[in-house]
């Protein structure tokens, strides 16, 4: 169950945002073997002065189409993560023209005791999930 936060600059259409959401969910679902209805995505749009995104000296040419995917998730297999990174970038580029240099991904692992889906309960810990 990853929680996917997606940060981007303001200016995209609702349709493009929905495509980004659908593509990223489909890729995560396949590569991380998610259960049905295991979809938690939050989009935040920023003014240009609210995000400074450099390239760590890698020579990337960032544009106003930059997207940051930050996932909080149970630990994932290294090979699954590599496939997720590669496929997400490929799908975004092929389907909506986002440059691979404009996609940054970060996955932060956490445990089952770090989640409550509602009612103040730890559903992973009390057997409901």
Predicted features along the sequence, with ranges:
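Interaction-mediating elements
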Residues: 1-129
């Amino acid at each position: 169950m990853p929680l996917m936060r997606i940060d981007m600059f303001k200016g995209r259409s609702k349709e493009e945002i929905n495509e980004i959401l659908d593509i990223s969910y489909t890729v995560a679902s396949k590569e991380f073997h998610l259960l049905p209805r295991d979809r938690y995505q939050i989009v935040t749009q920023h003014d240009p002065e609210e995000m400074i995104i450099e390239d760590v000296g890698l020579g990337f040419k960032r544009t106003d189409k930059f997207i940051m995917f930050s996932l909080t998730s149970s630990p994932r297999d290294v090979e699954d993560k590599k496939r997720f990174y590669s496929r997400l970038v490929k799908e975004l580029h092929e389907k909506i023209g986002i440059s691979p240099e404009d996609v940054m991904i970060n996955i932060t692992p956490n445990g089952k005791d770090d989640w409550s889906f509602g009612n103040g309960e730890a559903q992973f810990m009390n057997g409901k999930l």
